[in-house]
Amino acid sequence: MEKYENLGLVGEGSYGMVMKCRNKDSGRIVAIKKFLESDDDKMVKKIAMREIKLLKQLRHENLVNLLEVCKKKKRWYLVFEFVDHTILDDLELFPNGLDDQVVQKYLFQIINGIGFCHSHNIIHRDIKPENILVSQSGVVKLCDFGFARTLAAPGEVYTDYVATRWYRAPELLVGDVKYGKAVDVWAIGCLVTEMLMGEPLFPGDSDIDQLYLIMRCLGNLIPRHQELFYKNPVFAGVRLPEIKESEPLERRYPKLSEVVIDLAKKCLHVDPDKRPFCAELLHHDFFQMDGFAERFSQELQMKVQKDARNISLSKKSQNRKKEKEKDDSLGEERKTLVVQDTNVDSKFKDSKVFKIKGSKIDGEKVDKGNRAAVSMTVGPSHIKAVPSTSLRDCSNVSVDHTRNPGMAIPPLTHNLSAVAPGINSGMGTIPGVQSYRVDEKTKKYCIPFVKPNKHSPSGIYNMNVTTSVSSEKNLLQANKKRGEYSKTDVRLPELNYNHLPELRALEGIARNSRLIRKENKILSESRIPSLAAIDLHTPNIAVHQVSGSPLSDGSEADSPWMEHQH
């Protein structure tokens, strides 16, 4: 039973319950009847064994199909095809009765299914609206064969029969132990009027009340049944009810046609020996008029085939769904493998990148880089190849030299202006001049050959002195508000140390400019150096910056010391 998924309870009774389930393998929806612990209850075991035995030998389009039988933990499980609709559901939906044509089709199939059972000497004994299933295509299927049994041999008696009272024949009510197929025909007669009028024909509250309703509509019981009644200890001290005023079917249901009344009366004959067989009922005028029987037989075959196709399509749809789920799971596994592949050791990731972006050097260095690219361990340390990187490539990169003591330094490019041609682009300044109000994105930069936490000595603050002064002069003249000065006067703005912390070393220059302003001295031409980020502690770099010459190879002395281990 592990291959079935429980989808909910359909119904339950005295001997067990019916559950709606799904086959996990095929996806087919089934109905599973779970009996109570049959090993502890002989009656439950008897009913389960009887239904299993009968349904295994019964295969018909108007009988529910038994698919599988299994036993688990003293319980029997019967797996049926699932049909979630019954005639009782129709009657609850249409309390005033069903359409005549619908009833005609239902009755034809009910009689056809019961006739098939009778042809195999099996009586159902519990025909009622809730035991008659209707598929989506309108195919009727009899179910619940728990009370069904084979006909007794001559002289053999049946056990006590307990079923739904409203559809019970008179011979069953009085306790006759020799009954036969006619009990099912009686139940058919009760269904005829109930489906057309929407109300049960004999809704008795007790067995004696049931007998009273039958006798009032159909007359007195036959002598044999009356004798059995008075011999039955169940009715000891009770007399058969006297009928003062009868109410036949014609008077009770005046709207029903004569053909329908005739069909019901033949099925409801008080003498079971005078009730017709199912084959005779199928030839009744109710089914033969207008060629209904022949026409509907062909239609019924199409309905059965349609149901079979629906089951097949359901299986295929479920199989496609399972295949899609498998494909999705395989896709997820592939994604997981890709993620795992991208999360490999950084040695291999570095080797893949550097093989593509390696700098063009002589053949000997290439061979060394390739050997380093596979990240082979030589001694206690690792040797890694590093690509040549421009200033533009390292705009947001920080190099931790303490964590990478063995990193090799690529050859430096001497023309630094060519290395970083786009640094000043988009800043709104004249060529060669870099405004100290830099954009937030350009405040952080890194050059692999400069110590961390230290600004670059080239490029950004490499300016023309004369051009810088004239630009600052124009800015100061536009902001001048007080006093009259000569056109050649220059006022230096107050420096904000938040922007250029490196300018603290130039306080002397700013102080001299304020003294010049107080003395109102006229300057013919200002030769004040640009407010560049000059590192006074590295005179070689400062000299090259002021003169505008490129950084010589001697600047490598200011690069972080790297130890090469072989």
From Swiss-Prot:
Q: Which residue windows does the record flag with biased composition (Basic and acidic residues)?
A: 320-334
Residue ranges of every copy of the Protein kinase domain listed in the record: 4-287
Q: Which UniProt keywords apply?
A: ATP-binding, Cytoplasm, Kinase, Nucleotide-binding, Nucleus, Serine/threonine-protein kinase, Transferase
Q: Where is this protein found?
A: Cytoplasm; Nucleus
Residue span of region Disordered: 307-334, 545-566
Top enzyme class, one word, equals transferase
- Which residues catalyse the reaction? D126
The protein's Enzyme Commission number: 2.7.11.22
Binding sites annotated in the UniProt record for ATP = V10, G11, E12, G13, S14, Y15, G16, M17, V18, K33
Record InterPro entries? CDK, Kinase-like_dom_sf, Prot_kinase_dom, Protein_kinase_ATP_BS, Ser/Thr_kinase_AS
Can the keyword tRNA processing be found in this entry's annotation?
A: no
Keyword match Transferase: yes
Per the Swiss-Prot or TrEMBL annotation, the motif [NKR]KIAxRE is positioned at 45-51
Under catalytic activity, the entry for this protein gives: L-seryl-[protein] + ATP = O-phospho-L-seryl-[protein] + ADP + H(+); L-threonyl-[protein] + ATP = O-phospho-L-threonyl-[protein] + ADP + H(+)
Quote one Gene Ontology molecular function term: protein serine kinase activity
Task: List GO terms (cellular component aspect).
Answer: cytoplasm; nucleus
Written domain comment of the UniProt record? The [NKR]KIAxRE motif seems to be a cyclin-binding region.
Regarding protein family, the annotation reads:
Belongs to the protein kinase superfamily. CMGC Ser/Thr protein kinase family. CDC2/CDKX subfamily.
Protein name per its UniProtKB record: Cyclin-dependent kinase-like 2
Q: What species is this protein from? A: Oryctolagus cuniculus (Rabbit)
Cite the source lineage. Eukaryota, Metazoa, Chordata, Craniata, Vertebrata
